[in-house]
């Protein structure tokens, strides 16, 4: 291709993100307001949480530009391109809670956390662990985005500047999981095709004054975390 008339460029990318939380310990402390001498707290709803999240993303884009020379004042530029993107996510979590309703110990004693969960207090009649994981704690999701655009720069001398274009996008979002109570399977498969035109025209009345008109249409697409 003639470099002063045509330009071609392309980009490819891959992204991977992982987040693992092996053992988050959660303890709620409740203040006993009946005692006025020293603050006395007791433990409520302790929990251990494990999380594993993996994201993969692949993208590919290509652009083409061609310059025309019609006259000294009019040299339009035509642009076009395509873009493709694929993303996937897997999310798994497990939850474990402690049953504190046993009768073989004083739940409201002035324990520190290490003392409360000591080996002597862990048994079937005192404190025991139970899994509270539900189906809603895991899901898989993926999306596909395909786009193509064409635009033209139609400047005439130094007085008129005009840019017009349109972009077409195809978007497909899929997700498999469960409702928040973990009982109802949820399968999401959203497909949309949209056109996004844009126009930007300005006319220079003088070195200090110009008239401008512009129009554009865009969209904000949800992230995985906003869908779940």
Residue ranges and their predicted role:
Residues 12-13, 51-61, 67-228:
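Structural signature of Gram-negative outer-membrane beta-barrels, strongest in the C-terminal barrel
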């Amino acid at each position: 291709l003639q470099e002063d008339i045509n330009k071609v460029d392309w980009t490819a990318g891959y992204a991977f993100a992982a987040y693992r939380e092996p053992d988050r310990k959660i303890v709620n402390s409740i203040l006993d307001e009946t005692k006025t001498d020293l603050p006395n707290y007791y433990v409520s709803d302790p929990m251990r949480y494990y999380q594993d999240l993996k994201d993969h993303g692949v993208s590919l884009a290509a652009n083409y530009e061609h310059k025309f020379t019609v006259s000294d004042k009019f040299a339009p530029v035509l642009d076009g391109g395509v873009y493709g993107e694929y993303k996937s996510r897997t999310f798994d979590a497990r939850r474990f809670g402690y049953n504190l309703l046993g009768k073989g110990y004083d739940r409201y004693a002035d324990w520190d956390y290490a003392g409360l969960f000591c080996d002597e207090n862990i048994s079937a009649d005192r404190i025991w662990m139970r899994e509270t994981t539900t189906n809603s704690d895991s899901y898989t999701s993926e999306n596909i985005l395909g786009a193509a655009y064409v635009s033209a720069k139609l400047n005439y001398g130094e007085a008129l500047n005009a840019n017009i274009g349109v972009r077409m996008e195809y978007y497909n979002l899929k997700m498999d999981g469960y409702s928040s109570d973990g009982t109802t399977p949820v399968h999401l498969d959203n497909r949309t095709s949209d056109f996004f035109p844009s126009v930007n025209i300005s006319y220079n009345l003088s070195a200090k004054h110009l008239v401008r008109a512009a129009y554009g249409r865009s969209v904000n697409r949800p992230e995985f975390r906003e869908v779940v």
